[in-house]
Amino acid sequence: MVLGCPKREAVKEFGVQCLKQENVCPIITSRNQTHTHTHITISSSLTLHNGGLSLQKIIMGKTSKWFRSLLTGKKERTKEHIIQSECVFTSSIPGTPKEKRRWSFRRSSATGPPPPACAITLKDSPPPPPPPPPPPPLQQPFVVEIVDNEDEQIKNVSAEEIEEFAAIKIQACYRSHLARKALRALKGLVKLQALVRGHLVRKQATATLRCMQALITLQAKAREQRIRMIGGDSTNPRTSIHKTRINNFYHENEENIKIVEMDIQSKMYSPAPSALTEMSPRAYSSHFEDCNSFNTAQSSPQCFSRFKEYYNGDTLSSYDYPLFPNYMANTQSSKAKARSQSAPKQRPPEIYEKQMSGRRRSSMEAPRNNGVPRAVRMQRSSSQLGSNTAKESQQHHHHQYYPWMAIKLDRSNISLMESECGSTSTVMTNTNYGRHVDVQGNNNMY
């Protein structure tokens, strides 16, 4: 049943007093008893509606007891004590009370919001614990914030810095391209140089091998020709002709020596002297000793080697006797040196002393030649002239092939010219002829 206005005011006053004393909202639970005993169930809720405090109380039970307790106020203390004990009990044992059937004039909890739960505490109760800290935020929003910050920083970068960074990157790429290009060109150049050098080296090696082969073949041919010349002298017709001419020349020289000896033996029978004086036997002997010594000097190793070089190198090569190839012939300078070393320089001192002694003897024995018959001397001179004229044709051929013979004739004729003899004309003819042959021989040498 709904209370009237005076009852509402009384209830309001009671609620205000309770709030002032304990500052809590009293919640009185009901106890249902069986049979006829019932208690009063009071549910109170404090709500702020239109700026004022509205206290609603629904009283169920017997009205008589309620009015008595309300008017008399005897049992207020006992009720307060019961309420405090029940509040402590409920606070110590938290739990959800079982829902029971009760009479209520308010809206159900399903339709309306639940009433606020007010904690009933005592004055001596400890303060409530502090609230727990809030949970940490998730990582995903943090990452998003970092990305957002970077984007903001990039946006804040000036346009000049972006252009500079792009230019540096382009330059780096272009320089790397140029470096690769230069490296490829250098590799190609090195390969080309290696190919060219290898070709040149191979070409030079082949040229040297060909030259060596040509030299070896030339040396072999030269050796074969030398062996043939050494072993085939007897079969060569020209060498046989030269040998016969040399033998004839030596035989003629021996005959001339014999004629001179016969004239010397017949000079004892000449009564009167003549203008054409002859040589003494000592002069002749000294003259022929000089010739023999000259021959021995020519047969010495040095002179023989030079004669051999001259004979083999010049005469035989000029008359188709190639002991040496054409490229090994003597030059003009070497021939001039050989010509400068002529026979008078090569004459040994002993021969020169013998010639001087022979001249002195001839000068001392010149008066003795006056006793030689004039006819014999003339005959000998005429015989010498005839023999010389007969020999010219043969000696010409000999001097063409053997110019060294002119040197011997020249020396022998000079010694005869210096001696006192009657055949001066023959001596002069022989010397002139020897000089003429010597000049021809030297011309043939060149």
Curated annotation (Swiss-Prot):
User: What outcome is recorded for mutants in which this gene has been deleted?
Assistant: Reduced trichome branch number.
Composition bias, Polar residues: 379-392
The organism encoding this protein is: Arabidopsis thaliana (Mouse-ear cress)
Q: Which GO terms describe its cellular component?
A: cytoplasm; cytoskeleton; plasma membrane
A Pfam family cross-referenced in the UniProt record is DUF4005
Family designation: Belongs to the IQD family.
Query: Which segments constitute the IQ domain?
Result: 163-191, 192-214
* Record gene name: IQD19
User: Where is this gene product found?
Assistant: Cytoplasm, Cytoskeleton; Cell membrane
Q: How does it assemble?
A: Binds to multiple calmodulin (CaM) in the presence of Ca(2+) and CaM-like proteins.
Protein role = May be involved in cooperative interactions with calmodulins or calmodulin-like proteins. Recruits calmodulin proteins to microtubules, thus being a potential scaffold in cellular signaling and trafficking. Acts as a positive regulator of trichome branch initiation. May associate with nucleic acids and regulate gene expression at the transcriptional or post-transcriptional level.
Which GO molecular function annotation, any one, does this entry have?
A: calmodulin binding
Compositional bias per record (Pro residues), positions renumbered to this chain: 125-139
Protein's UniProt name: Protein IQ-DOMAIN 19
Q: Which UniProt keywords apply?
A: Calmodulin-binding, Cell membrane, Cytoplasm, Cytoskeleton, Membrane, Repeat
What residue spans carry the Low complexity bias annotation? Answer: 332-345
- Alphabetical list of CDD domains matching this protein: IQCD (cd23767)
Where is the segment annotated Disordered? Answer: 93-140, 332-398
Q: Which GO terms describe its biological process?
A: trichome branching
Q: Which domain of life is it from?
A: Eukaryota
Remaining remarks: 'Furca' means two-pronged fork in Latin.
Calmodulin-binding: annotated span: 214-231
Where does the protein principally reside?
Answer: cytoplasm
